Swiss-Prot record:
SUPFAM superfamilies: Fe-S cluster assembly (FSCA) domain-like (SSF117916)
Residues covered by region (Disordered): 1-26
Family, as annotated: Belongs to the MIP18 family.
Species annotation: Schizosaccharomyces pombe (strain 972 / ATCC 24843)
Stated name of the protein: MIP18 family protein C144.16
Species lineage: Eukaryota, Fungi, Dikarya, Ascomycota, Taphrinomycotina
GO biological process, one term: protein maturation
Amino acid sequence: MSANLQNENPEVKELNQLPSRVEEEEDLLLSSTKQWLTEIESEQTNIKEERDPIDPQEIYDLLAKINDPEHPLTLAQLSVVKLEDIEVVDNVEGDSYITVHITPTIPHCSMCTLIGLCIRVRLERCLPPRFHVDVKVKKGTHASESQVNKQLNDKERVAAACENEQLLSVLNGMMATCV
């Protein structure tokens, strides 16, 4: 964490204000029964199991607990990551992609690229390879929006950043609370 805070007083959401998937007891029972039947059918007939579709809530859940590099809070608590700013297109036969728009806490946030890189790394580690991941700064929320977007979606720059052990250590620290 930085000694000199750029945003000394960020707006913080309480954990109970964050979006979450609420499953009713019946839904859980139906879901587990369906999964069990699918597994049995798969074993008996060697039919390839259908893939589970991925929705924005699942992506949000993957990102919400990432720690901010400057504050002892999560990206969800700081509203850097919001459910409504996540787009998922999961095509069975075509291209599948995920776009996450991040909202920096201040327009001149120097941590924006680091946060975006962490989001990209987290998604690339967790998602099947069929997904193309785009991480972008939400329009009008950062002074260097186009430069940050270019860096976050340049495959060579991202790969080079992930080879830097010190930077990778920082990213892993930010993701340490993710389960």
